[in-house]
Amino acid sequence: MRIINSKEQIVIILRPSRIDIEFPRINKNLINKLLEKAQVILSDLSWILEHPLGNRIAFRSDFCIFDDELNAMRALSKNLNVVTNSNETTEMSIRLNTPEVIQGEPVNIVTNINNAIIGVKKDQEETKRKSSLITYDVNTVVTNTENRFEFETLLPYYEEMINNVFERSEHFN
């Protein structure tokens, strides 16, 4: 199900096991306010999902935060506190990419820094966790969707991916 708030241009997509929130045309100075708004939306909608596998905030914006800007990613995600009504693990991922970046690369490498509270609301202190997730998507433009999950397509980039994982994990705290 796709819900569109035309006034604020927020798109909420309810999937079988995930809630996606997309904010198009983001002003860099308003990100913290948008994160707070997304947090409220996710908390309000979390009861819909019996077994949520993840919550994703997707920013479609005029700027991009690249993999090497970890401090900026940490600043964006440090205050995320989304607690679902389920004991299932919930993952909050923040992805910031301009359409130009996604369309201009054969492989879209995105660092997701996650700091979400997971689990039942009464157990907030026991369910905190912090994680660094590095994802690699084959270009997700419409013309290339059939290759998105084919491992063979990623093979030419395998060494770069491994190096990226080790480098990012060494600096994550």
Locations of regions flagged by a protein language model:
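Generic detector of solvent-exposed, compositionally biased contiguous segments
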Residues: 1, 5-7, 27-32, 103-117
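N-terminal low-complexity, intrinsically disordered segments
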Residues: 1-24
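Signature of extracytoplasmic/envelope-associated structural regions
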Residues: 8-9, 44-50, 80-84, 139-141
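Aromatic- and glycine-enriched beta-alpha-beta binding-site module
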Residues: 22-65
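Aromatic/basic-lined ligand-recognition segments
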Residues: 57-137
